[in-house]
Amino acid sequence: MMKIFKRILPIVIIVVVVGLVYSFFHIDGREIKNIKKLSSDCKVSVVVSDTYGNENRQEYELNANQIEGLKNLLMNNSYKRRLSSTIIGQLPEKDYSILADWDNDGTSQVLLYIKVIGNEYINFSQQFNIFKHNIYHEIKNPDFEKELISILETE
């Protein structure tokens, strides 16, 4: 009996550790704080600008269908936590700042602020960060930026 226990215990410990490591690095879109509260009652704006400056800056105010599309895009994707706040390499040309305000009895409250850099990195303002560092997470969907642009361009 003890021999079986001695063989099974290390396997169980390894499986638990692997599960914990995976859950730490894997962020599901449904884990984003306040994402489920995003609705047509919110004022959602998206600012698209050049990564290296504010030339060609465009601002979009989203309608109800666009808000629902954005909510689905964010919730139905997954992201990979990074241990560094530094982005190394060539940055994409465009970045997107998503701001959702919720008006509660005349008092505006920021519900959600997300910064997206191209198709590669995303930051959920003060959420999923490590030791108070502002961390950009990797987007695991290779078509994320295309889908975001199609949401912004629909009327």
Write out the residue ranges for each language-model feature.
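Function-determining sites in protein domains
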Residues: 3-10, 17-155
